[in-house]
Regions:
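Phosphate-binding/switch loop-helix module in NTP-utilizing enzymes
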Residues: 130-189
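Conserved catalytic-core segment of NTP-binding enzymes
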Residues: 169, 173, 180, 184-190, ...
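Short hydrophobic/aromatic beta-strand immediately N-terminal to the Walker A/P-loop
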Residues: 65-68
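Conserved P-loop NTPase
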Residues: 35, 40-42, 151-157, 225-273
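Loop/turn-to-beta-strand initiation segments
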Residues: 92, 154-157, 190-197
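Conserved P-loop
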Residues: 70-134
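Intrinsically disordered, polybasic Lys/Arg-rich low-complexity tracts
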Residues: 3-37
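Pre-Walker A adenine-sensing motif
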Residues: 48-58
Length: 273
């Protein structure tokens, strides 16, 4: 017995969309734009030639970087040298000091051949002396006058000296942590490339270093060690996100033109942890 197959007509079901035609077109356009946007990965010079060589051409643009070291290791010189590199390239730069006076910084840097007053008169360099009280006001205002300056003058590089002095106003651990996080959030919003100096001190380290080490994009540590009858300075790239960097420890000296890193004489020092 054979069965007749009945022809079944397939009635196509019309699919309806809650989106209007113009909405659909708009979404396609936005999606297309998103797929074509590529995140730029740029590097900028640290201002120290040999440091650029061991960090794939320097700092990542718009990153936050921290220089850690004890007294006399060269943190402030590093911070200014980083800005000098930008100034020589025509960039506008900002130095925020929480400790030293403007006259002291200018006098010290002039000995290295860096005429900061000249750049200031050209409208390319700005120096701000900030007390801890002013920092609190700035954080409460969400940026305040510094944000206005950064945005209107198109500041490319910012050095903050030092982040430890910045938090000295806050007594409680939670207040310090919140202040640091708020400051870093502001700095990221401005998209400038930032260099922070941080005092290496056991009492300060316990309170702030763990937060800073996690939040910043790179950490460079400066050491001043007594070896035999004299003190020698060393530099270590402890961390640098998105960069294949050297893990060696290099000696450096402070010369007439700033920090000079000795890449050829790399050393491993068992006393450094």
């Amino acid at each position: 017995m054979t069965m007749k197959k009945k022809a079944i007509k397939k009635n196509p079901i019309k699919k309806t969309s809650p989106l209007k035609k113009e909405d659909s077109t708009l979404i396609k356009t936005i999606t297309k734009k998103k797929t074509t946007v590529k995140k730029k990965y740029e590097k900028i010079s640290t201002g120290i030639k040999n440091l650029d060589k061991i960090t794939e051409k320097g700092f990542v643009k718009s990153s936050i970087n921290m220089i850690v070291g004890g007294a006399g290791t060269g943190k402030s010189i590093f911070a200014i040298q980083f800005l000098i590199e930008g100034l020589r390239k025509g960039e506008t730069c900002l130095y925020i000091s929480f400790e030293e006076k403007k006259e002291e910084v200018y006098s010290n840097m002039l000995r290295l051949g860096w005429d900061m007053e000249k750049y200031e008169n050209q409208g390319k360099f700005f120096f701000l002396e900030y007390t801890p009280e002013k920092v609190k006001t700035m954080l409460d205002e969400g940026g305040g006058e510094i944000e206005t300056l950064v945005l209107t003058k198109n500041i490319a590089r910012i050095s903050v000296d030092s982040i430890t002095a910045c938090t000295s106003l806050f007594a409680k651990e939670t207040e310090k942590r919140n202040a640091i996080l708020s400051l870093l959030e502001l700095l990221r919003k401005w998209t400038s490339t930032v260099l922070l100096t941080c005092e290496k001190n056991p009492s300060i380290e316990k309170k702030t270093s763990s937060i800073l080490e996690f939040e910043v994009d790179s950490i460079i540590t400066l050491y001043s060690l007594r070896i035999k009858d004299k003190r020698e300075k060393f530099l270590e790239v402890f961390k640098m996100r998105g960069t294949k960097h050297s893990t060696e420890i290099y000696p450096f000296s402070i010369e007439k033109k700033g920090i000079d890193l000795k890449c050829k004489s790399c050393k491993r020092l068992p006393s450094i942890k």
